[in-house]
């Protein structure tokens, strides 16, 4: 029987519910349990795919092509699992599906209501997360804060699921804040008490309370929270502010959180707590010596969460070198051919990540040109690959006005264009090439050296492709098409052997990097940047 753990939050947002859920997932996985994890988002968008990065941050893509919340990236990296489309459920997706059923007549003319129709749809998606993965445990984070109007159907659904499945199969974890009042010189439990009171008013009694705090809690404070919130003293878990996110699983384990959960749900743990690998990772992070600077040239740099997985992947790649990879954030809207050297002269490597739209594209092209001409290690992702071919066409082939048809529909040289089957599609949502696709790598190339394989799979999120009408011209002038779809039709990777390190890919390798297992291209790129630094 699959067990379900629900993680809610109170008092304020940004308490770290996602990191708490991911850390618990890691602890349970290390005890030999099969874990999956899920995020409920109360917003009415069907998914974040068409939301502005300034609103939402990064869109994280799963193997099966779901466009999801960036928290799923934390989940995958912490627990080291690959999630699926059932791991991110939005209110928009739930309501949309219920309304489609109503239009089809599935409800036989009945009145469609939040209870039971919306709550039943939510519960169905809860169960699908477990069924689709055959998990021992499903951990579900409820977005928002207890008492938010938009979260109420989700709270009601997880209340009902306890009766549906039995108390022994369901557990509630509530994250709260323990603020420190400087004038009084003490921490206050009242916000936690009121948050739990609000949750209990909605029919949920938490089994565990995870308290976010700046300072170490006294036993008296824990006892007080336990008394007023009606839980066991050992079920009050302190989560202190940490210099590294990787400390959190160790903090929770030190307070036996995994043991409490295993006992409460009667789980069959195969191993005792074993966090040696995680401790080694944390020791590595805390002993980094020296830095490697990567210039990230993008249009959304004012909200760094827009590139969260890219930055995490760069950090992962620095760990084997015992180096801290520092990102220099460069707004491509500010860059041009005249000032590009001012922005990039002190970086060890240049990365142009994915993106959409014409704005600030010329600044990215200027950065790519600088990298190519000055032999600075270059790594392009998605749009960063597309613009690499555009820059090469303009400045090596001399095709003046060459561009992507997405960014300039009237370009005389559409180096990047839509596939014929995409040209009649008008909707933006869910119409990209999404998810895990195979790539065939050409032997005796940098790509082959990096992966040490001919056949790989990586995650994608794009609509436009390299236009094969220009492939021969670019190849004749020194660009190598080192990765393609298995049928050779779609370009997946390009490189310039003349440079020390110049590679770009159509896919998004950042979605498969792990703290203890850096993604191969990122690892090679950071190594090349380190060599460049020491030239």
From Swiss-Prot:
SUPFAM superfamilies: Class I glutamine amidotransferase-like, P-loop containing nucleoside triphosphate hydrolases. It comes from Staphylococcus haemolyticus (strain JCSC1435). GO terms for cellular component: cytosol. Catalyzes the ATP-dependent amination of UTP to CTP with either L-glutamine or ammonia as the source of nitrogen. Regulates intracellular CTP levels through interactions with the four ribonucleotide triphosphates. The active site is at 382 (nucleophile), 508, 510. UTP binds at residues 13, 188-193, 224. CTPSs have evolved a hybrid strategy for distinguishing between UTP and CTP. The overlapping regions of the product feedback inhibitory and substrate sites recognize a common feature in both compounds, the triphosphate moiety. To differentiate isosteric substrate and product pyrimidine rings, an additional pocket far from the expected kinase/ligase catalytic site, specifically recognizes the cytosine and ribose portions of the product inhibitor. GO terms for biological process: 'de novo' CTP biosynthetic process; pyrimidine nucleobase biosynthetic process. Pathway: Pyrimidine metabolism; CTP biosynthesis via de novo pathway; CTP from UDP: step 2/2. L-glutamine binds at residues 54, 355, 383-386, 406, 463. Residues 293-535 form the Glutamine amidotransferase type-1 domain. It catalyses: UTP + L-glutamine + ATP + H2O = CTP + L-glutamate + ADP + phosphate + 2 H(+); L-glutamine + H2O = L-glutamate + NH4(+); UTP + NH4(+) + ATP = CTP + ADP + phosphate + 2 H(+). Its EC number is 6.3.4.2. Allosterically activated by GTP, when glutamine is the substrate; GTP has no effect on the reaction when ammonia is the substrate. The allosteric effector GTP functions by stabilizing the protein conformation that binds the tetrahedral intermediate(s) formed during glutamine hydrolysis. Inhibited by the product CTP, via allosteric rather than competitive inhibition. It is an enzyme of class 6 (ligase). This is CTP synthase. Residues 1-267 are annotated as: Amidoligase domain. Mg(2+) binds at residues 71, 141. Keywords: ATP-binding, Glutamine amidotransferase, Ligase, Magnesium, Metal-binding, Nucleotide-binding, Pyrimidine biosynthesis. GO terms for molecular function: ATP binding; CTP synthase activity; glutaminase activity; identical protein binding; metal ion binding. Homotetramer. ATP binds at residues 14-19, 71, 240-242. Belongs to the CTP synthase family.
């Amino acid at each position: 029987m699959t067990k379900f753990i629900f993680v809610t939050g109170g008092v304020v947002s940004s308490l770290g519910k996602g990191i708490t859920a991911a850390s618990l997932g890691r602890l349970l996985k290390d005890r030999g349990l099969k874990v999956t994890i899920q995020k409920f988002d109360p917003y009415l968008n069907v998914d974040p795919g068409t939301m502005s990065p300034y609103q939402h941050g990064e869109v994280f893509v799963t193997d099966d092509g779901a466009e999801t919340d960036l928290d799923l990236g934390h989940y995958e990296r912490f627990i080291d699992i690959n999630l699926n489309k059932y791991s991110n459920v939005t209110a928009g997706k739930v309501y949309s599906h219920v309304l489609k059923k109503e239009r089809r007549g599935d409800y036989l003319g009945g009145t469609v209501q939040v209870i039971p129709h919306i709550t039943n749809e939510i519960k169905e998606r809860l169960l699908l997360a477990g069924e689709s993965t055959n998990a021992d445990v499903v951990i579900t984070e409820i977005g928002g804060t207890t008492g938010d109007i938009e979260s109420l159907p989700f709270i009601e659904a997880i209340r009902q699921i306890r009766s549906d499945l039995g108390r022994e199969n369901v557990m509630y974890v509530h994250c709260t804040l323990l603020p420190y009042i400087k004038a009084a010189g003490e921490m206050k439990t009242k916000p936690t008490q009121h948050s739990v009171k609000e949750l209990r008013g909605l029919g949920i009694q938490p089994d565990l309370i995870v308290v976010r705090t700046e300072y170490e809690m006294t036993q008296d404070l824990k006892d007080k929270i336990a008394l007023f919130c009606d839980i066991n003293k050992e079920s009050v878990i302190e989560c202190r502010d940490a210099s590294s996110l990787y400390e959190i699983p160790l903090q929770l384990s030190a307070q036996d959180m995994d043991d409490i959960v295993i006992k409460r749900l009667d789980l069959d743990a195969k191993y005792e707590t074993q966090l040696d690998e995680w401790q080694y990772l944390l020791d590595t992070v805390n002993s980094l010596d020296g830095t490697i600077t990567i210039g990230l040239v993008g249009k959304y740099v004012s909200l760094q969460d827009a590139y969260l997985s890219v930055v995490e992947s760069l950090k992962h790649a620095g760990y084997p070198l015992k180096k801290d990879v520092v990102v220099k954030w460069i707004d491509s809207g500010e860059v041009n051919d005249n000032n590009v050297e001012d922005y990039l002269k002190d970086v060890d490597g240049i990365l142009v990540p994915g993106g959409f739209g014409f704005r600030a594209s010329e600044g990215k092209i200027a950065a790519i040109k600088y990298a190519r001409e000055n032999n600075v290690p270059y790594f392009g992702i998605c749009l960063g690959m597309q613009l690499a071919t555009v820059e090469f066409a303009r400045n090596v082939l001399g095709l003046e006005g060459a561009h992507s048809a997405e960014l300039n529909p009237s370009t005389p040289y559409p180096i990047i264009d839509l596939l014929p089957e995409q040209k009649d599609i008008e909707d933006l949502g869910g119409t990209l090439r999404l998810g895990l696709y195979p790539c065939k790598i050409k032997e005796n190339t940098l790509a082959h050296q990096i992966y040490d394989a001919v056949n790989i799979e990586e995650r994608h999120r794009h609509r436009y492709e390299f236009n094969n009408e220009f492939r021969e011209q670019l190849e004749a002038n020194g660009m190598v098409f080192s990765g393609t779809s298995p049928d050779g039709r779609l370009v997946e990777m390009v490189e310039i052997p003349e440079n020390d390190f110049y590679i770009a890919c159509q896919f998004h390798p950042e979605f498969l990097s792990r703290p203890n297992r850096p993604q191969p291209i990122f690892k090679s790129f950071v190594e090349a940047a380190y060599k460049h630094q020491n030239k």
